Amino acid sequence: IRMGSAAANLVNREFESHGPRAILLTDITYIPLCGRFCYLSTILDACTKQVLAYAMSESLEVDFVLETVQLLVKHHGISLSKETVIHSDQGTHYTSLKFIQLVENSALRRSMSRRGNCWDNAPQESFFGHMKDELASEIPGWTSFEAAKASIDRWMDYYNNDRCQWDLAKLSPNEYYHYITTGEYPAGMLPLWVK
């Protein structure tokens, strides 16, 4: 991998204060699979907690990280701006010239955690922890990469659409995004005294 330089930390742990699509967090996690690992790359909106893009791979080559950014731009490009920051650690995937060029060509701004400081990307790390906890009973039963991917796909759909979170006004990430961009609280979720 041809390497570029690390980027400055533009986020400084101010994850939620800039609104939706302003700060996007990305990272890779290792997932056990039949005595080896498969790998998951995600891009998480720091404000809404939505998983905007993700890709899985059986290899740690940079391609699946690039695919994650490409999926982000394909599905959410219209809601991104030239001020949108994509924040990562200083791992080789994120300092590779391929990643740097893709992010710059996508008109996104790079930001990086300080070396070895997981707190600088804490919401992303926390997301992976919750995901693995909630999938703990399924992971041992995965017998193939396809089975792992199908399970992750189901969980991502559940997470974005149905997994309500206290910090998101008791809404799912997708409901919360709708709420903060339109001001409309989902009718089925209104407290009884409001109906």
Annotated model-derived regions:
Residues 11, 27, 43, 49, ...:
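Mobile genetic element proteins and their domesticated derivatives, centered on retroelements
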Residues 36, 55-79:
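Active-site beta-loop-alpha junctions of metal-dependent nucleic acid enzymes
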